[in-house]
């Protein structure tokens, strides 16, 4: 039961972070491109890579807080469904270049951030 509460608490934190970051990015850069979704996906992927590498290398044992971070916070912070919706909406609006750019940036940057996070931990081991 405690694990479920950790996941729920983490989900609330991650969802609030996602909303706040998305609103901040819209305020700073405008709503003509889904910068908020891109930022949360890239940052969340980087943190996920670090967390995974720490656990894989035995620096963080299967801790009860792992579900809070990896499933709760990062699961709610990053969101494939928002990425997919943003991309479809851009395409429906005829902004095909932005839709393709959104797909390319999310895929390449998120994969790179997971790898970077893992390598950052591996270089310190």
Curated annotation (Swiss-Prot):
GO terms for molecular function: fluoride channel activity; metal ion binding. InterPro entries: FluC. It is a multi-pass membrane protein. The keyword Acetylation does not apply. It is found in: Cell inner membrane. It comes from Aeromonas salmonicida (strain A449). The lineage of its organism: Bacteria, Pseudomonadati, Pseudomonadota, Gammaproteobacteria, Aeromonadales. Na(+) binds at residues 75, 78. Its main location: membrane. GO terms for cellular component: plasma membrane. This is Fluoride-specific ion channel FluC. Keywords: Cell inner membrane, Cell membrane, Ion channel, Ion transport, Membrane, Metal-binding, Sodium, Transmembrane, Transmembrane helix, Transport. It catalyses: fluoride(in) = fluoride(out). The chain crosses the membrane at residues 4-24, 35-55, 69-89, 103-123.
């Amino acid at each position: 039961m405690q694990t479920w509460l950790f996941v729920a608490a983490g989900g609330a934190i991650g969802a609030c972070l996602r909303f706040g970051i998305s609103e901040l990015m819209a305020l700073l850069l405008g709503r003509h491109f889904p910068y908020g979704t891109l930022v949360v996906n890239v940052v969340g992927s980087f943190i996920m890579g670090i967390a995974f590498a720490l656990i894989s290398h035995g620096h963080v044992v299967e801790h009860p807080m792992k579900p809070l971070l990896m499933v709760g916070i990062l699961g709610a912070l990053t969101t494939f469904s928002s990425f997919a919706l943003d991309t479809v909406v851009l395409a429906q609006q005829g902004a095909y270049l932005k839709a393709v750019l959104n797909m390319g940036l999310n895929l390449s940057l998120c994969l790179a951030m997971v790898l970077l996070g893992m390598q950052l931990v591996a270089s310190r081991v």
